[in-house]
Amino acid sequence: MPKLGMQPIRRRQLIDATLDAINEVGMHDATIAQIARRAGVSTGIISHYFKDKNGLLEATMRDITSQLRDAVLNRLHALPDGSASQRLQAIVGGNFDETQISSAAMKAWLAFWASSMHQPMLYRLQQVSSRRLLSNLVYEFRRELPREQAQEAGYGLAALIDGLWLRAALSGKPLDKTLAQSLTSHFIRQHLPNP
């Protein structure tokens, strides 16, 4: 019989072990046995909590997307009366939070995006994450721009965020936060009438 209160601890162990395995060998080569070994548990524990590898991968991506949401919301909540420019920079900062730009997180995101084209549940998670980013950006641009311009600016800033992130992920080098901040700030200033 499982010990009370162990589920959150075990789930965290397994998600962390999954990220480690993806970081080291990639999503497709990360086996249940490798993940269980890294977590110090039997493969049966993975089946118990997640049913199979896909369930574990989905839980891992839910965890990463939850960390992204929290990183953005924490920054926005710190600026309740902030200008559109400040709040847009907060959204950018959340997307470049340490939880999102570690080697393990970046590799997991890349694998997640690739797998989402073939797995409906991962596709749904990817769409939710993508829509959330665009919605947040458009909402802030909309404070100072007409709807169509706000949508265009939001789409452009989302593409810039994704592009900077993707270039860093594929380079194998850490994201240059100073450069990312400079480029996104410039984009925001170009699109807001009163930055």
From Swiss-Prot:
User: In which pathway does this enzyme or protein participate?
Assistant: Amine and polyamine biosynthesis; betaine biosynthesis via choline pathway [regulation]
Q: Which Pfam families match?
A: TetR_C_6 (PF13977), TetR_N (PF00440)
UniProt KW Transport keyword = no
Which residues does UniProt call coiled coil?
none
Question: Per the UniProt entry, what species is this protein from, by scientific name?
Answer: Klebsiella pneumoniae (strain 342)
Q: Name one GO molecular function term.
A: transcription cis-regulatory region binding
* GO biological process per UniProt: glycine betaine biosynthetic process from choline; negative regulation of DNA-templated transcription
What name does UniProt use for this protein? HTH-type transcriptional regulator BetI
